[in-house]
């Protein structure tokens, strides 16, 4: 979409924000603190990525029963809105695929804005792939 207008981009963001919720429990919930910010005063994207990785790992263990995974890919990470100090950020995770040794997890991140009385906005989405390993860090089959 080479000639995409700003209006088109805003409409796509609005459509993403109005997508139905994923069918999962909250994997983790964190209040963002001043230590999490970048030089622009918003939460550093790397902090969000780190929590996405943790949330996806929680879901992988919860859905497969296997207790050791390593992250092998983070796909299509989309930062939709900034996150601010004081936001209560929820990381929802949903298993999208379980293979022989790997599991794919979709993570949706929502921020309840500080002082917003419960109103949340979708801020980030990602797809994360994990591979099951044993205590020797060797790839193993899931649940078998």
What are these regions (language model features)?
Residues 47-66:
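Active-site helix/loop of acyl-thioester processing domains in fatty-acid/polyketide metabolism
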Residues 76-78, 95-98:
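Short, charged beta-turn/beta-strand-edge "cap" motif at the junction between a beta-strand
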Residues 66-82:
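Small beta-barrel nucleic-acid-binding modules, principally OB-folds
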Residues 36-51:
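A conserved, well-ordered hydrophobic junction motif at loop->secondary-structure transitions
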Residues 2-10, 16, 22-28, 84-85, ...:
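HotDog/MaoC-like acyl-thioester-processing domains
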